[in-house]
Amino acid sequence: MKVVLQRVSQASVTIEEQVVGQINKGFLLLVGICDDDTEADLDYLVKKISQLRVFEDEAGKMNLALGQVNGAILSVSQFTLYASTKKGNRPSFTDAGQPDYAQKMYNLFNQKLAATGIAVETGEFGADMQVALVNDGPVTILFDTRDN
């Protein structure tokens, strides 16, 4: 499982000119699922993301977690995180999870995030989406459960 986390001051996702998810301070998550991902991978990332201390405290040090700053999450599915560009100029997406499995895992991931008490907004799995954000910092962190 791969997640690109961006600390944002605001973010939104639009489908067919309608905003379907929107947050102010928090994390924009671009979420990629592969067929090897398990519920343990979800649990690992939920714990890491919910406890990640990348918000500034009163001393200006990145020391506060999302819940401590009343932040929210905008979670957007993104199979292109599993693009392979080893051959040619057209990416291959064969490492991305099969749609039914990936959607099930993506939905479960978002439910588990919400169960931590953090407000979670989402895009729509498989849709053509426009994502707008203001990256705060910038702070961008890559997670890959194959590396843990």
Swiss-Prot record:
<comment type="subunit">
    <text>Homodimer.</text>
</comment>
<dbReference type="GO" id="GO:0051500">
    <property type="term" value="F:D-tyrosyl-tRNA(Tyr) deacylase activity"/>
</dbReference>
<dbReference type="Pfam" id="PF02580">
    <property type="entry name" value="Tyr_Deacylase"/>
</dbReference>
<dbReference type="InterPro" id="IPR003732">
    <property type="entry name" value="Daa-tRNA_deacyls_DTD"/>
</dbReference>
<dbReference type="GO" id="GO:0000049">
    <property type="term" value="F:tRNA binding"/>
</dbReference>
<feature type="short sequence motif" description="Gly-cisPro motif, important for rejection of L-amino acids">
    <location>
        <begin position="137"/>
        <end position="138"/>
    </location>
</feature>
<dbReference type="GO" id="GO:0043908">
    <property type="term" value="F:Ser(Gly)-tRNA(Ala) hydrolase activity"/>
</dbReference>
<keyword id="KW-0963">Cytoplasm</keyword>
<dbReference type="GO" id="GO:0005737">
    <property type="term" value="C:cytoplasm"/>
</dbReference>
<comment type="function">
    <text>An aminoacyl-tRNA editing enzyme that deacylates mischarged D-aminoacyl-tRNAs. Also deacylates mischarged glycyl-tRNA(Ala), protecting cells against glycine mischarging by AlaRS. Acts via tRNA-based rather than protein-based catalysis; rejects L-amino acids rather than detecting D-amino acids in the active site. By recycling D-aminoacyl-tRNA to D-amino acids and free tRNA molecules, this enzyme counteracts the toxicity associated with the formation of D-aminoacyl-tRNA entities in vivo and helps enforce protein L-homochirality.</text>
</comment>
<keyword id="KW-0694">RNA-binding</keyword>
<dbReference type="GO" id="GO:0106026">
    <property type="term" value="F:Gly-tRNA(Ala) deacylase activity"/>
</dbReference>
<comment type="similarity">
    <text>Belongs to the DTD family.</text>
</comment>
<dbReference type="InterPro" id="IPR023509">
    <property type="entry name" value="DTD-like_sf"/>
</dbReference>
<keyword id="KW-0378">Hydrolase</keyword>
<protein>
    <recommendedName>
        <fullName>D-aminoacyl-tRNA deacylase</fullName>
        <ecNumber>3.1.1.96</ecNumber>
    </recommendedName>
</protein>
<keyword id="KW-0820">tRNA-binding</keyword>
<dbReference type="GO" id="GO:0019478">
    <property type="term" value="P:D-amino acid catabolic process"/>
</dbReference>
